């Protein structure tokens, strides 16, 4: 029996970071059954200038990164985590080619919410637009301009609470990893930056836009170019969404896996 216990302990220690994250989400995470998360992976392949100095101009150090590829890696991992927690996840922009407009992205999420509302069933909708940040014209690395940040629209509303929760989870995740957290000067009491970005301004639900480090800073870019970096970003978002569901809507943690709610809706593909 003693040997069996030792073997079990060894097996637990051998879980990868991601395997442990999925296990924790299913075993200890907030039960998000009844939550619909609209995930927007920022930008498309055709969006110009969205890449590291190496990817755009072969400026060393040789750290390749394209924002559209990075955001799709993050949202794919985040979808997996959120579904493990019981949420229904709607991928706002599954297409890669082209550059789907910001208004179209918000409209897709709004259409899903409006269509579901007509069924008379209850669900809580949130919108998350995932990006990476940059500074300069992309022709050189800009060390020192770095860190993680979250944005909401101007003024105080429920999205500020959402942003607070995700910022807290990101801080808990990234600070121990030695990564910088950014926040606005505390003139309105919360850490999020504010701007009326179209994609979150037009989303008719609590909506945030996250800037997941700078691909123009070598240290940040190297971090988000790794599997561990992508996974940590997904974990931070999932924990933050769970915090918001608890704080705002009274969702509870759970002891066992719950299958995700499926609104049972198929939206026709929209023209971008």
Question: Residue locations for each model-derived region?
Answer:
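Mature extracellular/periplasmic domains of secretome proteins
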Residues: 26, 102-123, 159, 197-203
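Loop/turn elements at helix/coil->beta-strand transitions in domains of secreted/extracellular proteins
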Residues: 33-35, 82-90, 119-127, 173-177, ...
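Active-site-adjacent mobile loop/cap segments within catalytic or ligand-binding domains
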Residues: 35-40, 116, 136, 182-272
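Solvent-exposed loop/turn segments at secondary-structure junctions
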Residues: 43-46, 89, 95-99, 132-138, ...
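Soluble non-cytosolic domains of exported or imported proteins
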Residues: 65-73, 99-103, 156-161, 224-235
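Extracytoplasmic/secreted envelope proteins and their assembly/folding machinery
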Residues: 72-79, 103-106, 147, 160-167, ...
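Active-site-adjacent substrate-binding region
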Residues: 159-190
């Amino acid at each position: 029996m003693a040997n069996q216990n030792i073997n079990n302990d060894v097996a637990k220690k051998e879980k990868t970071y991601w395997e442990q994250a999925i296990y924790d989400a299913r075993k200890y995470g907030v039960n998000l059954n009844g939550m619909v998360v609209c995930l927007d992976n920022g930008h498309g392949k055709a969006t110009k200038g969205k890449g590291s100095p190496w990817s755009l101009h072969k400026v060393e150090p040789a750290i390749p990164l394209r924002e559209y590829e990075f955001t799709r890696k993050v949202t794919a991992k985040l979808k997996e985590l959120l579904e493990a927690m019981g949420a229904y996840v709607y991928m706002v922009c599954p297409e890669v080619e082209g550059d789907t407009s910001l208004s179209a992205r918000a409209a897709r999420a709004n259409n899903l919410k409006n269509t579901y509302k007509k069924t008379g069933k209850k669900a809580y909708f949130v919108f998350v637009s995932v990006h990476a940040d940059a500074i300069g014209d992309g022709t050189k690395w800009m060390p020192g301009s770095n860190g993680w940040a979250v944005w909401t629209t101007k003024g105080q509303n429920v999205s500020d609470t959402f942003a607070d929760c995700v910022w807290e989870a990101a801080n808990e995740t990234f600070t121990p990893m030695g990564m910088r957290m950014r926040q606005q000067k505390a003139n309105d009491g919360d850490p999020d930056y504010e701007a009326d970005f179209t994609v979150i301004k037009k989303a008719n639900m609590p909506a945030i836009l996250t800037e997941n480090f700078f691909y123009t800073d070598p240290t940040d870019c190297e971090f988000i170019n790794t599997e561990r970096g992508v996974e940590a970003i997904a974990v931070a978002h999932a924990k933050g969404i769970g915090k918001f569901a608890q704080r705002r809507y009274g969702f509870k943690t759970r002891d066992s896996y719950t299958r995700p709610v499926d609104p049972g809706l198929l939206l026709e593909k929209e023209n971008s």
